[in-house]
């Protein structure tokens, strides 16, 4: 839409409302009208000359809603009022004047001299309109009404644009186009400094601040600096504990909108991020990125101390604390400190008694998912850890580590009372109770106390009647693994029968 010499007036692009029409607009729509008109004015002034002419300033006169456009070039102004609206407008005969831009012959990039000349004739504008160009006023008026329609959807909730992949709906076409990038994986915005690519221009803009070193916003509490005001606002909530974003489904609150969005997907089951290799879907893009490392075997994060590599930056950060000894996470109940937040959360369950991970076979509950996974191997018989020395297999990595000490002769834990040594610290602690007589594990049903938790668990099955160990030959179940082992030593088959009364296999001599 380049027009040489800019033979165009402000009234050509003005959108005028009658008094009745103006009264129908709410304050937000009036503000939108003003913003669009000012943008149109900038576009008009800069036609065909790029940045050589810009509007100098827009300022409030302090008198009601009056706004004044200062250009430094337009001489005569007059006010007109439409209802509550008052705007300084270029006098109605401004169409007799026009900007005439004259290029500086010596430097093509300098701002040119400007003059206000008489409009040559109205025929020029007529010829321009009939030369195949759409009138600029019509284009800008259409643009204003487009903005207005889009704004009204905020109030009506209308979302006419639908994603074909996941059927999510949007109020703006541009928002749909941005969303589609999630499915395509396209990253069209590239950093000119380091070639890193981004899905959104806003993410690129944020990234470029890293190269510029911009950090303008400082936290008054801890002195930490941020390159974005919004990031500082989120950070402030870590000090105040504020969680203003609430889930309508379960009432859980969050400090950031993004965390609420991720949480909502637990209720909806939405997983918009798809792996192109195996088709697996994820609720978070960050989890997809981590998953992709499974296919590539890529481990880009390396520890400078020991050279160990990791798939995730967070895992590397946790690993570094092994070298530094840093334990920033403290339990409020007992003041015990931990190097990882997940370890603290798991520890807290000791105080709360919470056991959120439940076995589907026997309904036994555990404090951590890793303990549940280990327990489930009791039912499946899986033993994935093999000793390289003797080929013996184990259900947990810890059992294998203890077993391997038998081959190395390593016995680290020694009793000061009787000089007995153990390959596990827990075994030594349990042994010490023989000398001290301590029995810290008490039955809640009968009050009987035991020196080890395993003995208490075994005892509690007397009260509950729980029998977790099943014989795969005859189907009989036992409360103790040792009883199952004894039972399995009895030959079963031709030399054995099953008593219908007691369901006890008996051998026949």
UniProtKB/Swiss-Prot annotation:
Tissue expr: Expressed at high levels in placenta, pancreas, kidney and heart, and at lower levels in liver, skeletal muscle and brain.
Domain KRAB: 8-80
Source species, domain of life: Eukaryota
Flavoprotein listed as a keyword: no
GO BP annotations listed: regulation of transcription by RNA polymerase II
One Pfam family from the record: zf-C2H2
Gene Ontology MF terms in the entry: DNA-binding transcription factor activity, RNA polymerase II-specific; RNA polymerase II cis-regulatory region sequence-specific DNA binding; zinc ion binding
Disease link: A chromosomal aberration involving ZNF320 is found in a form of glioblastoma. Translocation t(10;19)(q26;q13.3) with BRWD2/WDR11.
Task performed by this protein: May be involved in transcriptional regulation.
Name under which the protein is recorded: Zinc finger protein 320
